[in-house]
């Protein structure tokens, strides 16, 4: 499974894909305005997916800037 994360100015969204690229799960949270808050948010999405579906083989991320 693979995790993709999109960090934006107002929301951070994650998607979990199976090996064929089919969506398994999706989670959206508000983007925190601090560095530490943003990192904690990203980790909360990864932990959500891995706690629910098992360890992912990779994580890809996009963010502005």
What do these predicted regions represent?
Residues 51-65:
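Short beta-strand-loop/turn "lid" adjacent to the catalytic site in phosphate-handling enzymes
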Residues 2-40, 48:
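Short glycine-rich, Thr/Ser-proximal phosphate-binding strand/loop in the N-terminal lobe
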Residues 44-52:
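A generic secondary-structure signal
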């Amino acid at each position: 499974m693979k995790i993709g994360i999109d960090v934006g100015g107002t929301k951070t969204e994650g998607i979990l894909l199976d090996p064929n690229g089919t969506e398994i799960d999706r989670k959206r949270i508000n983007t925190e305005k601090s560095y530490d808050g943003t990192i904690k948010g990203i980790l909360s999405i990864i932990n959500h997916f891995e706690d629910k579906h098992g360890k992912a083989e990779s994580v890809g991320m996009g963010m502005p800037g």
